Amino acid sequence: MDTIRLTIDGQQIEVPEGTTILEAARTADIYIPSLCFHPDLPPAKDHPAVEAVFHGHHKIENAHPEQSGKGCGICVVEVAGNSELAGACATAAVDGMVVTTQNERIEAKRRENLLSIMARHRHACLTCAQRDGCSLSPCSTDVPENERCCEQFGHCELQQVANFVGIPDTTPRWVPTDYPVFKDDPLFERDYNLCIGCTRCVRACRDLRGIEALGFVLDENGQAQVGTVAETLDDSGCKFCTACVA
């Protein structure tokens, strides 16, 4: 296989042709934050939405059928010669390319994109001044339990990315969405209140397993809403392989 050479943050890197900027950076231990990327999955950007998804009996229709997935937008970088920032997870590295992963413009855009994710996800624990020594319960700042910690606290990808990118001061308080929590299915529970719309579960179901029991639509604000393609996992064709939660 042919190889190419590119420069990322002043470091010259040689990778196989077809490698993305994000993958190239990781071969050189250059960290580019991301939430929707997974090495075994195709990029979230341009992944097709479906006509409708279900949260149990509640049907959610696609408000933007002309659009496809956008990805999280956290992995944006600058490519010399391009006026627009590029998503590192979906942009192929090109021979001679010069990439910058950290500067004021990039950091501002990442914070902007993170804000749109944080605004629809419980995040009180990520902004709490006492989060490093928190015992999770009771809350010393009297934040209601449904607005704060989940079981992933301390081991959460969103928390790690937020710590690196920086949580915008303008992040509004999360308003509880009261999405349903499904506990009756075998092997795993589904709590849509914790979904950040990364669509990794959707892509794992479709591209790793070839099942397509899960899908996503775009709501009125263009945000991804994930759900099953029928009212139940069984009716959606789920095999309970757990690829979506692995």
Where do the language-model regions lie?
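Ferredoxin-type iron-sulfur electron-transfer modules and their immediate structural context
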Residues: 1-246
